[in-house]
Amino acid sequence: MILKKLVYPFLLVCLFSTGTFAQRLMHSIGITPTLLFGKSDDGYNSDVMIYQNMITYYPRFNFVENENSSISIGAPIGVGFGLARTTDYSDVGISFSYDLPVALDYNIGFKSTMENEHYFGGYLGMGFGYYKVSISKSAYSDFSGATYGPMARAGVRIGSAKESWKGHGLTIGFFYKKGIEKAKFSSAGCNVLVDL
């Protein structure tokens, strides 16, 4: 998949970057509760929901910066597990998944740049997401599907004096991805991340 070919090299560069590049590279880590929903392809056309709790690592690189804002590209990748079920509870299973999105964001205020001293900020962005799910202990145990499509995202960043949070901040964001694969599974979720 083309997305995998883009994300993996990006992550390697993020992990081994130094010098000036590292000053523009910012990291966050946290949790992302996510809900996937769509129709089953079992012939019954049942409504299916998959609830996931994911651990998320988000490296982002600011490639345009000014005093109070930036434009960044990032990859809020995650891995997690959860429950898959039909909406009438006729079938329930355990799911494992990973998420490989790429996001382009406009950042303003707090943590838009390393030098920004505001205590409040936010972001608005778009991207493309790839989400792989495997289900076990269910009638859908053979399902090992992927959902992918365009994504919209937005959120706020909150900080405080360096003495209390040691310069770290908190990001609370929301996203929605519309699946364009055959099953057309969509996903929505909330990021709660600590900005390092």
Residue map of PLM features:
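Cleavable N-terminal export/targeting peptides
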Residues: M1-M26
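Outer-membrane beta-barrel transmembrane domain signature
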Residues: Y58-I71, V79-F185, N191-L196
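Intrinsically disordered/low-complexity terminal segments and short unstructured peptides
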Residues: S17-G19, I31, T86
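Short glycine/proline- and aromatic-enriched beta-strand/turn motifs that initiate or cap beta-hairpins
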Residues: F21-N68, A188, L193-D195
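Transmembrane beta-strand segments of Gram-negative outer membrane beta-barrel proteins
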Residues: Q23-L35, I73-I77, G122-M126
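A periodicity- and composition-biased signal for non-globular, repetitive helical segments
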Residues: F10-L11, I29, E163, A183
